[in-house]
């Protein structure tokens, strides 16, 4: 019985989950919900099902795997990762995983808040001014390691790839000064399962956000 991943028909918080499902060769189907157009942005496709799925905290994304019903994007990632030993092995690796998991979400939400803000054009210059210093921290944290936790890939590499890719979509030259981050991106995209998925019709790189965002990618 395949797992069911439920989310809006955008990239959003499901991107890293989709990538991890593909990398682990997991059997899954997607339930994609469509947001209505402006000005109402009708959410009835989701709201009609929201409280009928048996979710403890009904929200998107969700993952249903038999009796296991999970919400919160990072809880979903961790659930999949535990099945495949992708949470780090040593204590040092697990600490690095925990740190980066939360750091990535902080940086992800900064960009989300900016892109949904009606004052986007006013706020964008300050965001871009501060971006190099934030990327420098990622570069220093990665160092000469192939993956963020160490020698072996973990689920936070999927989160890190997602947020770094979002930033280079937003500002295409932002990674130019950080060779190890560019190498990380290339290494990740070169993974056999990831490369195949990115070439498929199922892959969704654009539409970072919902229709109500002030700025979005195509």
UniProtKB/Swiss-Prot annotation:
Gene Ontology biological process terms from the UniProt entry: glutathione metabolic process
GO cellular component, one term: cytosol
Binding locations of glutathione: 7-8, 46-50, 59-60, 72-73
Keywords: Cytoplasm, Transferase
Compartments, record wording: Cytoplasm
GO MF terms, alphabetically ordered: glutathione transferase activity; identical protein binding
EC number: 2.5.1.18
Source organism superkingdom: Eukaryota
Recorded catalytic activity of this chain's protein: RX + glutathione = an S-substituted glutathione + a halide anion + H(+)
Domain spans labelled GST C-terminal: 90-207
Domain GST N-terminal: 2-88
Main location: cytoplasm
Alphabetical list of SUPFAM superfamilies matching this protein: GST C-terminal domain-like, Thioredoxin-like
InterPro entries: Glutathione-S-Trfase_C-like, Glutathione-S-Trfase_C_sf, Glutathione_S-Trfase, Glutathione_S-Trfase_N, GST_C, GST_mu, GST_superfamily, Thioredoxin-like_sf
UniProt binding sites for substrate: 116
Subunit composition and interactions: Homodimer.
Role this protein plays: Conjugation of reduced glutathione to a wide number of exogenous and endogenous hydrophobic electrophiles.
Family affiliation: Belongs to the GST superfamily. Mu family.
Protein name as it appears in the record: Glutathione S-transferase Mu 5
